[in-house]
């Protein structure tokens, strides 16, 4: 299975970079992982709603250009469906059984995802009703995908 993570914004913190590298290494046993890091738009402190929409649109266009047509797209969105780790593993396994060999997870920038990206998504996944920094979300996502593969493989994982 191929897993692509399309994300907006660079990781600046060394500890997050190290965690992402660690989970990327661990995932290499289970899948082909590709992380596509896209530039984020600068958001003025007092941006109007129209400016925020324009920023999300620009970021969304970049995201959509980096999603392959054959990918099953899972957008991380606060309004998405919450799943347990086991349910995410089951979903990934079922998608694989049904012939979906390429999963693309999408993480938006600080303003979230543009409506066109959400429309392209085959599934909207929420990790919480809380808002997380997109840099931290990348680490959490990789950990959960790794945990999902361990669950699918019947290997021990921390409950």
Swiss-Prot record:
The keyword Amino-acid biosynthesis does not apply. It is found in: Cytoplasm. The keyword Transmembrane helix does not apply. Its EC number is 2.1.1.177. S-adenosyl-L-methionine binds at residues 76, 108, 127-132. Homodimer. Specifically methylates the pseudouridine at position 1915 (m3Psi1915) in 23S rRNA. HAMAP family: 23SrRNA_methyltr_H. This is Ribosomal RNA large subunit methyltransferase H.
């Amino acid at each position: 299975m191929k897993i692509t993570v399309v994300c907006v914004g660079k990781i600046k913190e060394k500890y997050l970079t190290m965690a992402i590298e660690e989970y990327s290494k661990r995932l290499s046993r289970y899948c082909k992982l590709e992380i596509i890091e896209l530039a984020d738009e600068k958001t003025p402190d007092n941006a109007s709603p129209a400016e925020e929409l324009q920023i999300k649109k620009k970021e969304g266009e970049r995201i959509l250009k980096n999603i392959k047509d054959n990918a099953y797209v899972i957008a991380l969105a606060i309004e998405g469906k919450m799943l347990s780790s086991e349910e995410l593993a089951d979903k990934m396994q079922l998608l694989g059984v049904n012939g979906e060999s390429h999963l693309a997870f999408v993480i938006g920038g600080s303003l979230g995802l543009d409506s066109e990206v959400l429309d392209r998504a085959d599934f909207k996944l929420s990790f919480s009703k809380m808002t997380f920094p997109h840099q931290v979300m990348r680490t959490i996502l990789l950990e959960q995908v790794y945990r999902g593969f361990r669950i699918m493989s019947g290997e021990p994982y921390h409950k």
